[in-house]
Amino acid sequence: VMYGVVDFYKACKEAGIKPIIGCEVYVAPRGRTRFQKVHEFDSSFHHLVLLCRNEEGYRNLSYMVSQAFLEGFYIKPRIDLELLRAHAKGLIALSACLAGEIPRRLRNGEYDNAKAYALTLSEIFGPDRFYLELQNHGIREQAVVNKGLLRIHEETGLPLVCTNDAHYLTKADAYAHDVLLCIQTGKTVDDENRMR
């Protein structure tokens, strides 16, 4: 969602910081419209980070996020590759966290499929506007993904960027984030197996 963009932009400007507007979107594995929903296939989705380079990118991102709610809502608001192809101008894309499609394929041992998907995104955005996203949160799966991302980089020349999968601003916000995740997933903070 992009509900806080205007407030974010104003606060950054007041603080002398150049705002970079973006959104982590959900990408449907098949089509996004209500006519293309089969629970067995369409209840999954993956993350993709989109950042605006300019005003055209902001317009394209705003349009896609709106379409995700209007046409693509199935469990979550989703876009698809068709929408990305039509509205990629002015945007930079990052391969996302462990919930991204490329990391998912690497975790599942599908290196060739991960590489093919990375090349598809590079074709959509252009080789200078799609980045493989390296993260390190001390998670075993992340080391496997990073190794695969580095291999894709070495074989294709796709650029790398180091990021962090941040969900709150300060350590003090961790409890509120935990509570919100529990509400979203129907768990309690006492549940050892809850999402964190």
Where are these regions (language model features)?
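Phosphodiester-processing cores and adjacent nucleic acid-binding clamps
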Residues: 1-196
